[in-house]
Amino acid sequence: MKTLLLTLVVVTIVCLDLGYTTKCYVTPDVKSETCPAGQDICYTETWCDAWCTSRGKRVNLGCAATCPIVKPGVEIKCCSTDNCNPFPTRKRP
């Protein structure tokens, strides 16, 4: 009886996947990290600075509880699956 109860507890924990958190790419190292509890959104934030024409857009990657507010001149993409915010590739002419 104890074995059956223990088996049910283990199966419940495995099925519920308690404590699961999202993994996102995070700058500056652009490596995959587990997001803090409650931050289940990955985001990619891009914008132009003075070097945009020669170096490309600036990029900020990270985790958030909600999708960040869009500011003028800033593009934000949000997603909610593991590592869904890779560093964007630059389109070459």
Swiss-Prot record:
MF-aspect GO terms: acetylcholine receptor inhibitor activity; ion channel inhibitor activity; toxin activity
Any one cellular component term from GO for this entry?
A: extracellular space
The domain of life is Eukaryota
Q: What is its main location?
A: secreted
Q: From the UniProt annotation, give the residues forming the signal peptide.
A: 1-21
Q: Which InterPro entries match?
A: Snake_3FTx, Snake_toxin-like_sf, Snake_toxin_con_site, Toxin_cobra-type
**Location(s) in or outside the cell:** Secreted
Q: Which Pfam families match?
A: Toxin_cobra-type
Found in which tissues? Expressed by the venom gland.
Query: Keywords for this entry?
Result: Acetylcholine receptor inhibiting toxin, Disulfide bond, Ion channel impairing toxin, Neurotoxin, Postsynaptic neurotoxin, Secreted, Signal, Toxin
Biological-process GO terms, alphabetical: venom-mediated perturbation of signal transduction in another organism
Q: Which cysteines are joined by disulfide bonds?
A: C24-C42, C35-C63, C48-C52, C67-C78, C79-C84
What the record says about family reads: Belongs to the three-finger toxin family. Long-chain subfamily. Type II alpha-neurotoxin sub-subfamily.
Role this protein plays: Binds to muscular and neuronal nicotinic acetylcholine receptor (nAChR) and inhibits acetylcholine from binding to the receptor, thereby impairing neuromuscular and neuronal transmission. Pseudo-irreversibly inhibits twitches in chick biventer cervicis nerve-muscle preparations in a concentration-dependent manner.
Q: Write down what this protein is called.
A: Alpha-elapitoxin-Oh3a
Species source reads Ophiophagus hannah
